[in-house]
């Protein structure tokens, strides 16, 4: 017989989600909904003076922040896809990932320095402070900027393009939320970054 649950609701401001916590009689948490959290980007950009391609995401996901590196969710296809494009084995460690990027003249960073977000949901992003991309653009010869997904592209166009005066090409997101795109379809579209 399943234990009965007790629901406790805490109401936030009208635009925020109501936090619902279900407790079993022994007070174990069963499930919760997400509420807004203010996140500040904690990773340095990956680049060197030989970088030619810049790939921008939005902001590290919850799993990425837990793993202390970009694209840290095990179902995100970024590292598997990039390895396939570079004709290498999929890197496992931060050092291997960084080394692969730099060997292939690829820089990565994100468009958001800080924002309010629910979990890892890009659609919930608000109150954005953008990153200063000149940190990269002034120190290497970036020939093309790519967005990993529509949200990264839209945020770049809104916040960074007026300052950089550089166009961005939007590629389909490698996020597990973009399940409509198989790894093969992503490979076909992303292959332009190494042309």
Give the predicted meaning of each segment.
Residues 152-156:
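Short, well-ordered alpha-helical microsegments
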Residues 6, 15, 28-29:
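Charged/polar low-complexity intrinsically disordered segments
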Residues 52-58:
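Short, hydrophobic/glycine-enriched beta-strand segments
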Residues 63-124:
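Short, surface-exposed acidic-centric catalytic microdomains
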